[in-house]
Structure formats: structure tokens, C-alpha cells
Amino acid sequence: DVYKRQLLFGVVAGISRLVERKESRQKMQPFLDRAGEYDVLFLGDSIMNTGVFPMEMWEKYGIAGYNIASYGNTLPITYWALQNALDYAKPKLVVLDVQGVSKSYKLSGNSSDVHTAFDCYSISKTKIEALDDLMDDPNAVDDDGVAYVDMKWEYLFTLGKYHARWSELTDTD
């Protein structure tokens, strides 16, 4: 009985990984593969994402950094992206773009921004805490009018979000 559950979990996890959007994993897999090697993490929204190039720091100063910033990140998303990253890495320095500090909302209207920030991380206590915090407002909706509260499980189990993506799969999936 336990083996059947483990097998089912493994199959669901494998299918989820196959059909998920790849943006989050493409951005974060190099970080996850070498998380212990980074001295500096950069976090924030599009300003940080497009304005900081860790490879230049490496080439000029020998400082290893990784840019976790992403388009549409609010300060709460950035905070939880950092907390999730700290489950994997212990950088000496974190550089935080706080341009969005005056925004009064936790989530932007684009739910794909949240997926980009969190899909790459395995289910963990930190990821669950992040989603509980970010998706606690029943009035917060995405651009399609869907309440984030109703989408929380899609961020933990991406198969719920991407199950219909079969027709879009390519050889690179």
C-alpha cells in the first residue's frame, strides 16, 4: 500500500515536471544545481533582473553571484523568493531592489509572475508558508479575475495548472 502511494506520487511528480512551464526551472536550475557556490544573491523586479549581471562581477572581481530577480515581483514575492532560496544557499550578501516598497498589494495581476518565482522550488515548509502568506486575501485576483486564494494548490502541485499543456510539448520538454 505504501509502495503504491510512493509510485503514484512519483508518477504525478514526473508528469507535473514534464508539462510545467519551463521559465522558472530554466532561470533557477543553474542556481539550484550550484546553490552553495554563490556569495551574493540579487532579488527584486524587472529593474534588478535586467540591470545586474553577476557574470561581470565574477569576471572583474571573482565574486560568484546569482540573479533571482524576476519581472513583476512585488516586495512580498521577493521576500518569499529569498526565503525559498535560503533553503538552498547561504550567501554572504543579499542585494535587494526595493523600488516596489510603496506598492500596497502582495501580488501583481499576472499569475505567471508568481509561477515564475515559485514553480522551480520543491514543496517545502517555506514554499507552503509563502503561498499561505501571499494568497491570504480573497479579494486579490489575477488578470483573468480568478482569486489567488483559489489557485494556491496550482502553485504547490503544478499539474493542476499545466495538465492541458500536452499539445504544446516539444522535444525539449
Stretches found by the model and what they are:
Residues 2-3:
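Short, small-residue-biased leader/transition segments that mark boundaries at the very start
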Residues 15-37:
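Alpha-helical transmembrane signal-anchor/signal-peptide segments
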Residues 27, 90-92, 152:
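Basic side chains
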Residues 43, 47-134:
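Membrane-embedded segments
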Residues 111-173:
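Secreted/periplasmic serine-hydrolase-like ester/acetyl group-modifying domain
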